[in-house]
């Protein structure tokens, strides 16, 4: 539901699934969806020294969408191949982490499918920082130290294994308040072993932001979206299952085709994913190159796929049909044997693993001498003769080999991709190139090729090879012109200035798109274009290869079957993408440039004002507040249950107050959601008990911690309701009216810990202005005290200083930034003058009651002090006694004071201890309305 993705409104029931499109309409009016600069990063976009890394509108949108002010916990970034998803994630992390020491996340965690992608991501981050701050006098050591302390990288599988070995408590303590980025998030499938571990880990974190990067969120079925949805949910109760998805979120209709069922999204599908997605298709339409799909369209019933066909040799045809004639129980459901044969049949008629073991070296992945001789057909033969001989075993490999060699000799780079490496796969094609005289490695230009697979290269070697291949000097293949790649380069890798891309058939189009996108992406052909001498765009040629058998035209080979299956799946996926785009968040500035009209979505920003930022700032709460919880609860136990009354007393709130539980919830909820606290306790409010657990598994089974009261005007003020409702509850006189009637003082909030007073008061005052329907500041001043000075900020600072004491310093609200800052020295005299005026007024009130003394109560320690009423306004005095603790007065003096206010102390022979006398004095002064709260009870405060 949208409310799970956009928790903008306090709710009474967490299981309610109410939702409306109007909520998303309101959200998109804010600057996060319209601003062209990063809102909260300290970096100015104009400082960029490298224009190629200047953020684009769709990247800024995501970065601003996940700021500390935003209530959004996570988003699926479905941006097409080549749109700069890596930089999008980098900007989002920086925009959040650098937004403020007490607001943003503490660290970034990047999880990638493999180490090659991880190194590529890390290099992009390093390059961005060095380019970004090259004029900030930061050396490499300073940058490396900052990055190593702030950003952590790991592969998905390695981190999942770490999660499985680590307790929940340790994981929460170590990783709470983390900005998590999962690259190629579609690799986390429901059937995989890593998904439940990563999903459980994210559920542990009470404070986190999550970005899931993917260009192809669905590979085979629409239900591939299930893990992406669940990874964003903070509670497991909000997760959905594949069965629920297929039942409620899509309609399924069996096709006459042999490939797959037709799936269509429902309205419930839109509701589930609204607000969770940022959608942007691939930017090939506006790329600087023209994409040419080589081959024929419409072959073998394929409607959209352009393929290059290769007719089987006689040996391949016989082997292929013999392999397909076996019993079904003996067949691989993925037709792996047929796929191997379509690639290559070895000279002895074997294929796949059997032929590889005979003709290839298992340790090195290189061909045996015997195999090379067989491929060459003898010594002294020409290239044409070798290719003709290779065609007996694989017409496809012979055709591709000739194509890439001819291209290399023209100064054009090529990429050949295959998901099968051993068997009849990529390493056998490498053997064909070696038979033609090419060498593995680099340095010989058109005579060199690289084989980027984990079977023959380490990850560092692959990263180094990619740098050489992408280097400016290698734009025309001067060092190496041909690159062979497996799944290790299928995602998250950039191949620059590739002119020819050769790919094989896949069971889904998503993998094919990912592979093609390695060489066609943003700025991928910048060097080629810089050297281009024509007004026409350079061409990039894409070859989708398929092996057929012209001898049996009524039989479709496995390659044709795979392409047909991909087309059928593409229909379903395109329908789901259109549905996602209709409820996706898009920035207005990117619509005309990147997003096709059908994909622009119905929600774009409008009504932009300078004040249009999401109005959610967490109160300034520090760990000292949590320290008090530690004193009350013994967290060494697995579970702790304490009565609500005990917790209320901890905060000096009267348990008999009608509104005490309401205030308690506001405080506890604020603590739970604050990103900088590392609260590793799980709090549940249920009736008259507060349960706290260190075990999140048990906490998951408990009801969600929600407002224990019904809010009014929830839909009247839109986004402001969350903020204003909280502010209203904080400053409302009714919140503790029952508890405060007997005191006669103006201090309901002063009974809370000082740091909480400051944070809640600052939040309340920050809501002042035309968008404050509750008139928060004026109500606060009216309730807590008035002043003749018309400056609201100064009055707020005076009240805050009076409440928290001089040691906390004076703080005022900066009307331009909307944040609280230390009081400028020029304003300190005004604050002190007003503070003295307030104290003088208090003294005069006591004189009007004909009292010589009044009581002072410390809000946190509950110490009771007695202060003498001065006959003159306490000004121009170096030091004023704020009041001694009552129990430190002499017995005779206490009896005298008690008699002055009408307390019977008995005759001179009666004996009463000082504690009893102090209790009687406090009770009497409370009846007279002569007890105030002050944190300076029992100490001296110097005044200059």
From Swiss-Prot:
GO MF assignments: ATP binding; ATP hydrolysis activity; nucleic acid binding; RNA helicase activity
Signal sequence range: none
Superkingdom, taxonomy of origin: Viruses
EC number: 3.6.4.13
Catalytic activity: ATP + H2O = ADP + phosphate + H(+)
Motif (DEAH box): 183-186
Cited InterPro entries: DEAD/DEAH_box_helicase_dom, Helicase_ATP-bd, P-loop_NTPase
Keywords assigned by UniProt, alphabetized: ATP-binding, Helicase, Hydrolase, Nucleotide-binding
PROSITE patterns: HELICASE_ATP_BIND_1
Helicase ATP-binding domain: residues covered: 66-235
Domain Helicase C-terminal, chain residue ranges per copy: 451-523
Gene3D superfamilies: P-loop containing nucleotide triphosphate hydrolases
Ligand binding (ATP): 79-86
This protein's record includes keyword RNA-binding: no
Family: Belongs to the DEAD box helicase family. DEAH subfamily.
The protein's name in its UniProt record: Putative ATP-dependent RNA helicase
Organism of derivation: Heliothis virescens ascovirus 3e (HvAV-3e)
